[in-house]
Amino acid sequence: MNMQNFHYHFLKTNNELTLIADDLRSIFDSTLEKVISLTEEVETDIVVRHSPINSIPELGSSGQYTKDARCIDVYLDLDSPHLKSNFETEIARTLIHEYMHVVREQYVPWENGTLLDSLIAEGLTQSFEIEVQPTLPPSIYA
């Protein structure tokens, strides 16, 4: 697989991600390999930052996609006990979920979507999470 279409950016303002950057790259590479085998490859920037305020407290992580820039933002709370004990699972789950939004956006652009549109989009991403990780339930925080 050609991983040149995925650009990882680890924000280093306070060096919080320095010690885990290689682990994150490894998780991203293995997760994207599975994802691409089930869908298509869309050039995407993946930006990771330590941001407790943007993380879901129960997970220690969260993510979002930026449709026009084909960018995924991954927010981590590196002090979260849940994230520390479920690091690979939560990172992979976030990437799978947000990447599916990026792929969907290529075919069904989001413009002034309704609540129904949001429910459908989140349902599709959760179904994809199950397809990629069949032994794990999808996140309840879609």
Which sequence ranges carry the predicted segments?
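Short pre-active-site segment immediately N-terminal to the catalytic Zn-binding motif
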Residues: 77-94
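Active-site recognition of the HExxH zinc-binding catalytic motif
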Residues: 93-106
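Post-HExxH zinc-binding segment in Zn-dependent metallohydrolases
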Residues: 115-142
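Hydrophobic, aromatic-lined core segments that form the binding pocket/scaffold
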Residues: 68, 75-76, 103, 132
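Membrane-interface helix caps and helix-loop-helix hairpins in membrane proteins
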Residues: 108-111
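Cation-handling catalytic/transport regions enriched in His/Asp/Glu
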Residues: 45, 50, 88, 113, ...
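Auxiliary, metal-adjacent structural segments of Zn-dependent hydrolase domains
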Residues: 9-70
